[in-house]
């Protein structure tokens, strides 16, 4: 059995249990090989082991039954014991309730007795207190203070309490009978008050917070309590302003006081507010006045910079102080302090700002024109000048000489950046220093100054000068600088628009001034665009005029009707070469001067005029067969030049012109077929006829019959 018990090892696994049994049986395992294996011995061992297991099972079963009986017996005993405990607990709970009721009854009696005792004791205490006060009053009446409380400096707290009460009593006494004693009490009241304040001062210098708290609590009922607070505030600031930055010093001071004032005074928020008021009205106000008054009349630029910087730093300090407990309406309190410092400077701020901005802008412009040795001329306006301008635009008559600008656009990006920078700073100061109700109006005033000096005095003047510098369309070898003006004006417009959106819009976005500013901006831009359009139109006229001069000078009648038809080199003419070179140069200049759709619009207009010029130019000549081939070569080159425009409509016009030129060389019998071709079918017959009439063989070949 012992052997069987040893086989039951934890954790029990049946397979392992069989393996261990087989291994322990001689001849039952794999030791010794197949020859040593004895199945009968193994079977016998298994049978014996099963019998042992059955015996073990019976023994364990008997033991389990015995334990179950014992467990049931103990459970019955435990249940009986629990019932007994419940009964005793109920008895104890009843005793507890009785005791609680008795305690409540006794407590009620005690409270009643206490009220009775208090009713007796309070008058007695008052009587004792009154007796003491009468005793002390008699000492003042006799003129000799004998009590220890008045002579012992260590009992100053008790003396203060007594004298404060005597002082209140003395105020109720008639002056004619008790004037002397009232005077003595008042004198002692004042002496004790001074002693307490001196004690508070000494404790503050020693850093004894607990002593300061005790003295402040005693002084709270004295008239000199406010003086105690003043002393505290004054001593707090001793040695507090040692750095170069008074605003940083003030912030550190207030933060330090905020941490300790609650440990000293019963009303810390009032004391801290008084300290902050003292810092603002005395220290900061004198510093601000010193910084601003010295440059207020002599240097407007420095004055505005200092005002903006000081106001910003003051408001930043105020924002930090908002974290402290200063009472219920600390926002209003701090705003009033800031206003008290800066009100005299903010009242006329916008006048100083606009005055400085005007003078500064005028100086920037004048300095630029002086650097160019240019005296600004008066641009004529009114009826006569407008009439001349309209006549010149429509007829190109030389109504007075054009101005030679020597290639100068009189536009400077540096000047523009300086003007915008000055205006940007003005907008920033305006945002910070203007009252919210005045902000949109003040911002609009700054914007009008920007419009006056940037848009009118600089850009508009440059456009007018550029317009006056455009030569008439019949001028030869004219230098066309207006496109440079266009290029620079476009760049400046972008900068102007960016500042409008970035710096002006946030200031006026929620006010009626928004629509006013947008309208003014729209009017300015429309006015500028109209002058740009006028200048571009006249510049294009000059370009076409220059092409006319080239064609008139270089194109010969013999180009298209050579004397020797058999000795002609088929290529484009010299006039075509020079015109195409000129056109390509102008196209490149236009692309560099403009952006976006403006390039396409101007190139389309130039392309249409270029086509009209070549069309009319070809109408002036008579063409032989070989001359017609030369004309086709020229138009092919013109068409190649038109491709550089990258405008489909212009290319289509030259494609059609090229097809028309084919009418100059086509065989008479095929003429009708060509006229009805895809490219020419939609053209008016008169146009086709006019081109056919240019052929040298028009009469001899009787070509008119095709159009009858």
Curated annotation (Swiss-Prot):
Protein name per its UniProtKB record: Exocyst complex component 5
Entry keyword set: Acetylation, Coiled coil, Cytoplasm, Exocytosis, Phosphoprotein, Protein transport, Transport
Localization: Cytoplasm; Midbody
Sample GO molecular function, one term: small GTPase binding
Main location group: cytoplasm
Free-text tissue specificity from the UniProt record: Ubiquitous.
Family note: Belongs to the SEC10 family.
The protein's assembly and partners: The exocyst complex is composed of EXOC1, EXOC2, EXOC3, EXOC4, EXOC5, EXOC6, EXOC7 and EXOC8. Interacts with EXOC3L1.
One of the record's GO cellular component terms: cytosol
Function: Component of the exocyst complex involved in the docking of exocytic vesicles with fusion sites on the plasma membrane.
List of residues that carry N-acetylalanine: 2
Coiled-coil annotated residue ranges, if any: 40-101
Phosphoserine PTM positions: 412
Species this chain originates from: Homo sapiens
GO aspect biological process, one term: post-Golgi vesicle-mediated transport
Phosphothreonine, modified sites: 122, 395, 405
The keyword GTP-binding belongs to this UniProt entry's keyword annotation: no
């Amino acid at each position: 059995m012992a052997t069987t018990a040893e086989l039951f090892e934890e954790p029990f696994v049946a397979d392992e249990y069989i393996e261990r049994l087989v291994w322990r049986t001689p001849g039952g395992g794999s030791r010794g090989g197949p020859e040593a294996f004895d199945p009968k011995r193994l079977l016998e061992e298994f049978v014996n082991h099963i019998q042992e297991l059955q015996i073990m099972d019976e023994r364990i079963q008997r033991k389990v039954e015995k334990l179950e009986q014992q467990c049931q017996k103990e459970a019955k005993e435990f249940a009986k014991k629990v019932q007994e405990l419940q009964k005793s607990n109920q008895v104890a709970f009843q005793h507890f309730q009785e005791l609680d009721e008795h305690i409540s009854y006794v407590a009620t009696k005690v409270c009643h007795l206490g009220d009775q005792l208090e009713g007796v004791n309070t008058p007695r205490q008052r009587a004792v207190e009154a007796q003491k006060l009468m005793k002390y009053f008699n000492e003042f009446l006799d003129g000799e203070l004998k009590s220890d409380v008045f002579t012992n400096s260590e009992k100053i707290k008790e003396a203060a309490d007594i004298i404060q009460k005597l002082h209140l009593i003395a105020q109720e006494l008639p002056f004619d009978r008790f004037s002397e004693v009232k005077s003595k009490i008042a004198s002692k009241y004042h002496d004790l008050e001074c002693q307490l304040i001196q004690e508070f001062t000494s404790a503050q210098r020693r850093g004894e917070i607990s002593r300061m708290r005790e003295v402040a609590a005693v002084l709270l009922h004295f008239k000199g309590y406010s003086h105690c607070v003043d002393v505290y505030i004054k001593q707090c600031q001793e040695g507090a302003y040692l750095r170069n930055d008074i605003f940083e010093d003030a912030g550190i001071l207030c933060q330090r006081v905020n941490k300790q004032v609650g440990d000293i005074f019963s009303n810390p928020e009032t004391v801290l507010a008084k300290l902050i008021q003292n810092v603002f009205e005395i220290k900061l106000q004198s510093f601000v006045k010193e910084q601003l008054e010295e440059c207020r009349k002599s240097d407007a630029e420095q004055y505005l910079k200092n005002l903006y910087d000081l106001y910003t730093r003051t408001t930043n300090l105020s924002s930090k102080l908002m974290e402290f407990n200063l009472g219920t309406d600390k926002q209003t309190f701090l705003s009033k302090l800031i206003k008290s410092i800066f009100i005299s400077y903010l009242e006329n701020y916008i006048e100083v700002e606009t005055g400085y901005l005007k003078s500064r802008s005028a100086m920037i412009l004048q300095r630029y024109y002086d650097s160019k040795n240019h005296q600004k001329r008066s641009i004529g306006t009114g009826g006569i000048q407008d009439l001349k301008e309209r006549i010149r635009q429509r007829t190109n008559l030389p109504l007075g000489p054009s101005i030679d600008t020597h290639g100068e656009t009189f536009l400077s990006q540096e000047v523009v950046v300086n003007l915008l920078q000055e205006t940007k700073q003005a907008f920033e100061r305006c945002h910070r220093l203007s009252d919210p109700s005045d902000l949109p109006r003040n911002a609009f005033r700054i914007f009008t100054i920007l419009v006056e000096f940037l848009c009118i005095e600089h850009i508009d003047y440059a456009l007018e000068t550029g317009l006056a510098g455009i030569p008439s369309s019949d001028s030869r070898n004219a230098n066309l600088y207006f496109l440079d003006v266009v290029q620079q004006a476009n760049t400046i417009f972008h900068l102007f628009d960016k500042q409008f959106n970035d710096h002006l819009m946030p200031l006026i976005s929620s006010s009626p001034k928004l629509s006013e500013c947008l309208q003014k901006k729209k009017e300015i831009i429309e006015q500028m665009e109209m002058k740009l359009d006028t200048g571009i139109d006249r510049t294009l006229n000059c370009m076409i005029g220059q092409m006319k001069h080239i064609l008139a000078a270089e194109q010969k009648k013999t180009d298209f009707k050579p004397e020797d038809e058999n000795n002609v080199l088929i290529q484009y003419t010299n006039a075509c070469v020079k015109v195409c070179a000129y056109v390509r140069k102008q196209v490149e200049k236009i692309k560099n001067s403009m952006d976006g759709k403006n390039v396409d619009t101007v190139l389309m207009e130039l392309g249409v005029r270029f086509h009209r010029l070549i069309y009319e130019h070809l109408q002036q000549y008579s063409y032989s067969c070989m001359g017609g081939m030369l004309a086709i070569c020229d138009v092919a080159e013109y068409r190649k030049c038109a491709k550089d425009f990258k405008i489909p409509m212009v290319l289509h016009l030259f494609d059609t012109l090229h097809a028309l030129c084919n009418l100059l060389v086509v065989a008479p019998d095929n003429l009708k077929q060509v006229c009805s071709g895809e490219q020419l079918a939609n053209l008016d017959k008169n146009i086709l006829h006019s081109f056919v009439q240019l052929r040298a063989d028009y009469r001899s070949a009787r070509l008119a019959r095709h159009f009858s």
